[in-house]
Amino acid sequence: VVGCGPTQTGTTGATHQVTDGTGVAVTVPSEPKRIVPIAASTEDIVLSLVDPSRVAAVGTVVNNVPEASAKVEKHVKATAESMLSVQPDLVLVPNWMSPDAIGEMRNMQIPVYVYKTPTTVEEAKAVIHEIAGLLHASDETMIASMDADLKTVEDIANKHSGERPLVAFYTQFGLTGGKGSTFDDMTKYLKVHNAAAQLGLGPFDNGTREDLIKANPDIIIIPSVAYTSDGTTPATAEQLYSDPALQGVKAIANRRVFLVDSSQVMSYSQFMTRAMVSMAQNIYSK
């Protein structure tokens, strides 16, 4: 089994070997003190589990824990060179990150633990539990708050009798959140039909404006601002309401376009259930 080598950057004290989410054996400190979480959701989880003093650096994307993040002075990019500058004893990354970047870090003896990106609420809880174990931290409060959110969502949805609404998740890239996506899992808790899934779209597909017209949803959910670095402007309710081609769509005619916080709805951290509460309140508002 290939580990990360016995000598590691910034590692002091006892270490042990663990197998990460991709099956790679990684030597990690028993009590990591220079953690670098990569990606906004990883930061959400890590900075909610441990004191910011144990976090060596964070990235540059907006996360859901700005106060804790402000206590972390260093900012890094997900490259070996950038990582070496902060001497981490544990780097946590999701498996959607470039294998080349991960390989490069490992070649530099940086201990990288890769976790499998969750696509459901239950998988998100499992990842939080996995990271908590790695950091010797308790995830009890975080999981309890997610469960409380899910209970709130269930209570709101159960008060609604009659036809379940058809909901579309629409971003500046088009109709999204198809079958197998995180949003698709959320719709099961919200007790709504998913427009993108009904049209046969998958987790990474983007449907067109024509698809939105064809779906004719009762409700359209749009993220407040999407994670975008290419300067594309996020979709807005005003833009949809004023589009002549969309006037026949039920959600437009009935003014049922709702905004949800993108850093919550697009996360797979404990904040995803906050987005679900917000969506439930909007979907079932009179």
Identify what each model region corresponds to.
Residues D100, K116-E130, G162-M186, D230-G231:
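Extracytoplasmic ligand-binding site segments that recognize negatively charged/polar headgroups
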Residues T60-N64, T176-F204:
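Alpha-helical, coiled-coil/dimerization segments enriched in small aliphatic residues
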Residues R34-V86, L90-N95, A195:
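A short, structured surface patch at a secondary-structure boundary
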Residues T79-V93, I110, T208-V225:
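Proline-aspartate-enriched helix->loop->beta-strand connector
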Residues A39, N95-W96, T117, I219, ...:
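Short secondary-structure boundary segments
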Residues T19-G23, K71-E81, G200-R209:
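Short helix-initiation/N-cap motifs at beta->coil->alpha
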Residues V2-S41, S138-A168, N282-K286:
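Bacterial Sec-exported substrate-binding components of ABC uptake systems
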Residues E123-L135, D139, S224-K286:
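Structured C-terminal subdomain patch of bacterial secreted/periplasmic proteins
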